């Protein structure tokens, strides 16, 4: 089948509903949970603000529009390699210089929802990924891998979403060996349903924050605060995760969409 025929076929199946578009994005607004870092460690991203310019009134009689205060890494978002010190030297590591061909790819969905419900500090290891592959098939080069935890169900309550106490945040994520294994498979990027791509306690790992550290070291991408991964199959969907083309952007809120064969 030619590429033209394949695209025509996909278009027809989208129009017929045989291929469903699943929104993997959380709502972006003033109540969106935002990562909170210790003030003695680093500055924090401000909360999202939406301010009205006009709404069919004296400030604009025929139109409605707003202006916003918005951090690059707010809500469902994309981490570019330049986001982390290990990726700082890539000329194509910004949101305006990256290769857009890489942004749309098959997605592997590793379901860790039961484990994460039982233990908020659950860690996905390389051995668990290999066991998943034995059941569902190999993870291919250039593909996305995302960890389903159903953490998005907490997004309406920032305290529950961040899940922090005096020992720090508690949320599921990958181990260093999990990320190294995925990088050996030549993935394009890794995604999480939590506030960031790492586990809550990842600061104590070696290296610290391995998803950030290792992914961006290898010029790969991260996705965070994904939603509705429970609507995706383990394999067979296509993920579209395109950041805004921000000049020298280290990341961007995204509208993450998945193309899924309708059951």
From Swiss-Prot:
This enzyme catalyses: isatin + H2O = isatinate + H(+)
Q: Where is the active site?
A: 83 (proton donor/acceptor)
Q: What is the effect of changing residue 225 to A?
A: No effect on the affinity for isatin and on the catalytic efficiency
- EC class of the enzyme, as a word: hydrolase
Q: How is the cofactor bound?
A: Binds 1 manganese ion per subunit.
GO BP terms? L-tryptophan catabolic process to kynurenine
Q: Which Gene Ontology molecular-function terms are recorded? A: arylformamidase activity; hydrolase activity, acting on carbon-nitrogen (but not peptide) bonds, in cyclic amides; manganese ion binding
Q: Which UniProt keywords apply?
A: Hydrolase, Manganese, Metal-binding
Q: Which Pfam families match?
A: Cyclase
Instruction: Describe its assembly.
Output: Homodimer.
Similarity comment text for this entry: Belongs to the Cyclase 1 superfamily.
What does this protein's UniProt record list under function?
Answer: Involved in the degradation of the plant hormone indole-3-acetic acid (IAA). Catalyzes the hydrolysis of the cyclic amide bond (lactam) of isatin (1H-indole-2,3-dione) to yield isatinate (2-(2-aminophenyl)-2-oxoacetate).
> What name does this protein carry?
Isatin hydrolase
Q: Which organism is it from?
A: Roseibium aggregatum (strain ATCC 25650 / DSM 13394 / JCM 20685 / NBRC 16684 / NCIMB 2208 / IAM 12614 / B1) (Stappia aggregata)
């Amino acid at each position: 089948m030619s590429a033209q025929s394949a695209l025509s076929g996909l278009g027809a199946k989208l129009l017929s509903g045989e291929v469903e578009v699943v929104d993997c994005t959380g709502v972006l607004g003033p109540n969106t949970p935002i990562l909170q870092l210790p003030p003695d460690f680093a500055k924090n991203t401000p909360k999202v603000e939406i301010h009205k310019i006009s709404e069919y009134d004296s400030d604009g009689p025929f139109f409605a529009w707003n202006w916003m205060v918005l951090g690059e890494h707010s809500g469902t978002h994309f981490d570019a390699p330049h986001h982390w010190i290990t990726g700082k030297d890539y000329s194509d590591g910004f949101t305006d210089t990256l290769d857009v061909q890489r942004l749309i790819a098959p997605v592997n969905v590793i379901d860790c929802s039961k484990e994460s419900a039982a233990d908020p500090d659950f860690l996905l290891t390389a051995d668990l990924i290999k066991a998943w592959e034995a059941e569902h098939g190999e993870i291919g080069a250039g593909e996305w891998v995302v960890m389903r935890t159903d953490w998005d169900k907490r997004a309406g309550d920032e305290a529950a979403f961040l899940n922090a106490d005096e020992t720090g945040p508690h949320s599921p994520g990958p181990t260093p060996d999990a990320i190294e294994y995925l990088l050996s498979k030549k993935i394009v990027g890794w995604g999480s349903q939590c506030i960031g791509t790492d586990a809550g306690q990842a600061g104590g790992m070696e290296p610290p924050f391995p998803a950030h550290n290792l992914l961006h070291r290898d010029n790969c991408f991260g996705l965070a605060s994904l939603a509705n991964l429970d609507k995706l199959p383990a394999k067979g969907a296509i993920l579209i995760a395109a950041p805004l083309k921000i000049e020298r952007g280290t990341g961007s809120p995204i509208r993450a969409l998945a193309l899924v064969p309708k059951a």
